[in-house]
Curated annotation (Swiss-Prot):
Homodimer. The tRNA molecule probably binds across the dimer. The gene is SARS2. The modification N6-succinyllysine is found at K195. Residues 1-34 form a transit peptide. GO terms for biological process: mitochondrial seryl-tRNA aminoacylation; seryl-tRNA aminoacylation. This is Serine--tRNA ligase, mitochondrial. Pathway: Aminoacyl-tRNA biosynthesis; selenocysteinyl-tRNA(Sec) biosynthesis; L-seryl-tRNA(Sec) from L-serine and tRNA(Sec): step 1/1. One of its GO terms (cellular component) is cytosol. It comes from Homo sapiens (Human).
Length: 518
């Protein structure tokens, strides 16, 4: 127990700048800013070292078995690591394994020495045992072992941290059929429906929504910042209708409904293959001066994965299918892309599918195909024209083994736009978050995880408004959503839209007690 505690404390102390000095611990840590510390940290590793979870069980053996093949696969993925980084990671891991075996052997010997000393003390009186050469030899050997371990524990902590800080950046394996390259190399698997034909120049969703007074995005910088929006009336009903339509369909298919926290620890994000400490990051971080390590989730996938973290699922309950509607928060740091409209916004509602399967690619691949089929069914019932893409290597991120995107036609934008994504993450997330299943024999094994968008509201609003617009400015409601809106057509408002009276207006009515401004 003492040895285990010592090994647990070493990385915590050294990471905070503490060093042994004359039998005591002193702090030599220089002052560092939060942003400086973030760059060299891995929250998942720290989370484990502080005892909240076990260390990630990364599958390094597969890299060691075929290092050339692994290096080639790494080069094809987009990420921080390149093939030249792999040998150092493998070397560090091998050295760490050898050192841990040496420590284990010494700790076993130390335990045996302790037992032998206790046996001598039990059978002889104190005076006699002190003179016993065997006792003296055991005590001397015990001191030697402790000295060796005192030097080995810090080295183990150093190697362990060095290994995990790099190895946790390694991506998942890649399906052999995945196209190689960037998004331009995506393979079209299916083309469903036809492009809508108009006798007029189709308008964009924002113009349509503003004229119908169902979307507001103007003059919000002083209210909620850029890339925010309001949905009003039929716009809000469309959102609720899409969520309820999707939810009801999935509940009928046996999905378990869930709600999840919006605020989560960084370790859960990193366990899912996301990087809250990246610069820039798409993840909103709560001020660490007030709330340590809390982040706003950009997808319910993170919360659902966190639900299973450090837990086992009974084998007979597999595969698990879950559905969750949540508000998603994304920084959208590339402000040059689509600055107006609903395509890239800081917050939106999304319905997410999440699955946990047993071992082997067959089960998780089947669930991925099932999720994709449901996505296609939903979009078909909404009457949209769309295409299914097999995404290439550089679009898989860290966790995906294979990923399918669906892009819907958006006439106002004049191009396809991504509306759903589905990924098979195999055991990438479960090895980091310890998502396990228990066999009927009681054995624990790593599960596979699969996630997929069921309904991303803003992007579906774009496709629906632009595809169903009419010459008179109204919008037809798809039959699948008519019961939720109570109408088959969204028409011009009968109310008077709000009038802006804030600063920088050429004409505005006077405020109480003030003349009108011209």
């Amino acid at each position: 127990m003492a040895a285990s505690m010592a090994r647990r404390l070493w990385p915590l102390l050294t990471r905070r700048g503490f060093r042994p000095r004359g039998g005591c611990i002193s702090n030599d840590s220089p002052r560092r800013s939060f942003t400086t510390e973030k760059r060299n940290r891995n929250l998942l590793y720290e989370y484990a070292r502080e005892g909240y979870s076990a260390l990630p069980q990364l599958d390094i053996e597969r890299f060691c078995a075929c290092p050339e093949e692994a290096a080639h696969a790494l080069e094809l993925r987009k990420g921080e690591l390149r093939s030249a980084d792999l040998p150092a990671i493998i070397s560090t891991w091998q050295e760490l394994r050898q050192l841990q075996e040496q420590i284990r052997s010494l700790e076993e010997e130390k335990a045996a020495v302790t037992e032998a000393v206790r046996a001598l003390l039990a059978n002889q009186d104190s005076g006699e045992v002190q003179q016993d050469p065997k006792y003296q030899g055991l005590r001397a050997r015990g001191r030697e072992i402790r000295k060796e371990l005192v030097h080995l524990y810090p080295r183990e902590a150093q190697l362990e941290e060095q290994f995990y800080l790099q190895a946790l950046k390694l991506p998942n394996q890649t399906h052999p059929d995945v196209p190689v390259g960037d998004e331009s190399q995506a393979r079209v698997l299916h083309m469903v429906g036809d492009k809508p034909v108009f006798s007029f120049q189709p308008r964009g969703h924002l113009e349509i929504g503003e004229k119908l007074d169902i979307i507001r995005q103007k003059r919000l910088s002083h209210v909620s910042g850029h890339r925010s929006y309001y949905l009003r009336g039929a716009g809000a009903l469309l959102q609720h209708g899409l969520v309820n339509f999707t939810f009801n369909k999935l509940l009928r298919r046996g999905f378990t409904p869930m709600t999840v926290p919006d605020l989560l620890r960084g370790a859960v994000f990193e366990g899912c293959g996301m990087t809250p400490n990246a610069n820039p990051s798409q993840i909103y971080n709560i001020d660490p001066a007030r709330f340590k390590d809390l982040n706003l989730a950009g997808t319910a996938e993170v919360g659902l994965a966190g639900y299973f973290m450090d837990h086992t699922v009974a084998f007979r309950d597999l595969p698990v299918r879950m559905v969750c509607s949540s508000t998603c928060y994304r920084a959208e740091t590339n402000t040059g892309q689509e600055p107006r409209g609903l395509y890239r916004v800081h917050h939106f509602t999304k319905v997410e599918m999440f699955g946990v399967t047993g071992p082997g690619l067959e089960q998780s691949s089947q669930l991925l195909e099932e999720f994709l089929s449901l996505q296609m069914e939903i979009l078909t019932e909404l009457g949209l024209h769309f295409r299914v893409l097999d995404m290439p290597t550089q679009e898989l991120g860290l966790p995906a083994y294979r990923k399918f995107d669906i892009e819907a036609w958006m006439p106002g934008r004049g191009r396809f736009g991504e509306v759903t994504s589905a990924s098979n993450c195999t055991d990438f997330q479960s090895r980091r978050l310890h998502i396990m299943f228990q066999t009927e024999a009681g054995e624990l094994q790593f599960a596979h995880t699969v996630n997929a968008t069921a309904c991303a509201v803003p992007r579906l609003l774009i496709a629906l408004l632009e595809s169903n617009q009419q010459k008179d400015g109204s919008v037809l409601v798809p039959p699948a959503l008519q019961s939720y809106l109570g109408t088959d057509r969204i028409t011009a408002p009968t109310h008077v839209p709000l009038q802006y009276i804030g600063p920088n207006q050429p004409r505005k009515p006077g405020l109480p007690g003030q003349p009108a401004v011209s």
